[in-house]
A protein has these predicted regions:
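Charged (often Lys/Glu-rich) extended helix/loop segments that serve as interaction or gating elements
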Residues: 1-141
Length: 141
Protein backbone atom coordinates (compact mmCIF):
# COMPACT_ATOMS: atom_id res chain seq x y z
CA UNK A 1 0.00 0.00 0.00
CA UNK A 2 1.04 3.59 -0.60
CA UNK A 3 0.85 4.58 3.06
CA UNK A 4 3.62 2.28 4.22
CA UNK A 5 6.47 3.42 1.98
CA UNK A 6 8.70 6.45 2.08
CA UNK A 7 11.52 7.84 -0.03
CA UNK A 8 14.79 8.95 1.58
CA UNK A 9 16.62 11.78 -0.12
CA UNK A 10 19.70 13.83 0.75
CA UNK A 11 19.32 17.58 0.73
CA UNK A 12 21.72 18.98 -1.84
CA UNK A 13 21.58 22.66 -0.97
CA UNK A 14 19.38 25.59 -0.03
CA UNK A 15 18.57 28.42 -2.38
CA UNK A 16 17.12 31.42 -0.54
CA UNK A 17 15.10 33.88 -2.56
CA UNK A 18 13.31 37.18 -2.10
CA UNK A 19 9.88 35.61 -2.62
CA UNK A 20 10.56 31.89 -2.04
CA UNK A 21 13.13 29.64 -0.44
CA UNK A 22 14.05 26.41 -2.17
CA UNK A 23 15.29 23.20 -0.55
CA UNK A 24 16.92 21.28 -3.40
CA UNK A 25 17.09 17.52 -2.88
CA UNK A 26 18.41 14.58 -4.89
CA UNK A 27 14.97 13.00 -5.43
CA UNK A 28 13.12 14.36 -8.42
CA UNK A 29 9.93 14.20 -10.46
CA UNK A 30 11.21 11.09 -12.21
CA UNK A 31 11.33 9.29 -8.83
CA UNK A 32 7.92 10.48 -7.61
CA UNK A 33 5.85 12.10 -10.40
CA UNK A 34 2.58 12.48 -8.45
CA UNK A 35 3.17 16.04 -7.15
CA UNK A 36 4.12 17.29 -10.63
CA UNK A 37 1.33 15.39 -12.39
CA UNK A 38 -1.63 16.28 -10.19
CA UNK A 39 -0.41 18.20 -7.15
CA UNK A 40 -0.50 15.14 -4.86
CA UNK A 41 0.54 15.87 -1.28
CA UNK A 42 3.29 13.86 0.42
CA UNK A 43 4.46 14.85 3.90
CA UNK A 44 8.19 15.65 4.00
CA UNK A 45 10.10 15.35 7.27
CA UNK A 46 13.77 15.52 8.33
CA UNK A 47 15.31 12.16 9.28
CA UNK A 48 18.15 13.71 11.29
CA UNK A 49 18.25 16.15 14.14
CA UNK A 50 20.99 18.43 12.74
CA UNK A 51 18.46 20.92 11.43
CA UNK A 52 16.52 20.88 14.70
CA UNK A 53 18.90 23.60 15.92
CA UNK A 54 17.57 25.87 13.17
CA UNK A 55 14.34 27.83 13.16
CA UNK A 56 11.87 26.29 10.71
CA UNK A 57 11.58 28.13 7.41
CA UNK A 58 9.10 27.74 4.60
CA UNK A 59 10.56 26.02 1.53
CA UNK A 60 9.49 24.63 -1.77
CA UNK A 61 11.15 21.20 -1.84
CA UNK A 62 12.37 20.66 -5.39
CA UNK A 63 14.54 18.22 -7.33
CA UNK A 64 17.67 18.92 -9.39
CA UNK A 65 16.02 18.45 -12.81
CA UNK A 66 15.71 21.77 -14.64
CA UNK A 67 11.94 21.55 -15.13
CA UNK A 68 9.27 23.81 -13.68
CA UNK A 69 7.36 20.70 -12.56
CA UNK A 70 10.26 19.21 -10.61
CA UNK A 71 8.88 19.71 -7.13
CA UNK A 72 7.99 17.33 -4.31
CA UNK A 73 6.34 19.73 -1.89
CA UNK A 74 5.38 23.39 -1.86
CA UNK A 75 5.42 25.76 1.11
CA UNK A 76 6.70 23.26 3.68
CA UNK A 77 7.88 24.43 7.09
CA UNK A 78 11.16 22.61 7.73
CA UNK A 79 14.03 22.96 10.19
CA UNK A 80 16.83 21.62 7.99
CA UNK A 81 20.58 22.05 7.78
CA UNK A 82 23.18 21.21 5.15
CA UNK A 83 23.55 17.46 4.71
CA UNK A 84 20.26 16.49 6.38
CA UNK A 85 18.31 13.56 5.03
CA UNK A 86 14.62 14.05 4.33
CA UNK A 87 11.85 11.47 4.07
CA UNK A 88 9.01 11.88 1.59
CA UNK A 89 6.20 9.88 3.17
CA UNK A 90 3.42 7.69 1.76
CA UNK A 91 5.26 6.76 -1.43
CA UNK A 92 5.13 2.95 -1.22
CA UNK A 93 2.95 2.21 -4.23
CA UNK A 94 4.12 5.17 -6.27
CA UNK A 95 7.90 5.45 -6.62
CA UNK A 96 8.42 1.94 -7.97
CA UNK A 97 5.42 1.81 -10.29
CA UNK A 98 5.39 5.42 -11.52
CA UNK A 99 9.09 6.29 -11.48
CA UNK A 100 11.04 6.66 -14.70
CA UNK A 101 14.54 7.26 -16.01
CA UNK A 102 13.70 10.73 -17.32
CA UNK A 103 16.81 12.84 -17.97
CA UNK A 104 18.89 9.64 -17.69
CA UNK A 105 18.37 9.53 -13.93
CA UNK A 106 18.66 5.95 -12.67
CA UNK A 107 15.87 4.54 -10.53
CA UNK A 108 16.76 4.35 -6.82
CA UNK A 109 17.30 1.18 -4.81
CA UNK A 110 14.35 -0.22 -2.89
CA UNK A 111 14.56 -1.66 0.60
CA UNK A 112 12.06 -3.69 2.57
CA UNK A 113 12.26 -2.92 6.28
CA UNK A 114 11.16 -5.74 8.57
CA UNK A 115 11.50 -4.64 12.17
CA UNK A 116 15.18 -3.80 12.67
CA UNK A 117 16.28 -5.57 9.46
CA UNK A 118 16.46 -3.92 6.03
CA UNK A 119 16.54 -6.06 2.88
CA UNK A 120 17.56 -4.84 -0.57
CA UNK A 121 14.68 -5.84 -2.87
CA UNK A 122 15.78 -3.89 -5.95
CA UNK A 123 19.29 -2.60 -6.64
CA UNK A 124 19.83 0.99 -7.71
CA UNK A 125 20.08 1.30 -11.48
CA UNK A 126 23.15 2.73 -13.14
CA UNK A 127 23.35 4.86 -16.27
CA UNK A 128 24.75 1.76 -18.00
CA UNK A 129 21.58 -0.12 -17.03
CA UNK A 130 19.48 2.55 -18.71
CA UNK A 131 21.41 2.33 -21.99
CA UNK A 132 21.92 -1.45 -21.95
CA UNK A 133 18.97 -2.31 -24.25
CA UNK A 134 19.43 0.59 -26.68
CA UNK A 135 20.89 0.03 -30.14
CA UNK A 136 22.45 2.50 -32.56
CA UNK A 137 21.26 2.61 -36.15
CA UNK A 138 24.12 1.89 -38.58
CA UNK A 139 25.27 4.90 -40.57
CA UNK A 140 25.19 4.83 -44.35
CA UNK A 141 28.55 4.79 -46.10
Amino acid sequence: PAGIGWARTPKLFMKPGEQKNFCIVDAAMNDLPRPAMYQAYHAIVPLEAAGAQQEPQVYDVVGPICESGDWLGRERSLAVAAGDLLAVLSTGAYCSSMGSTYNTRPRPAELLVDGAAAHLIRARESVSDIYRSERLVPTKA
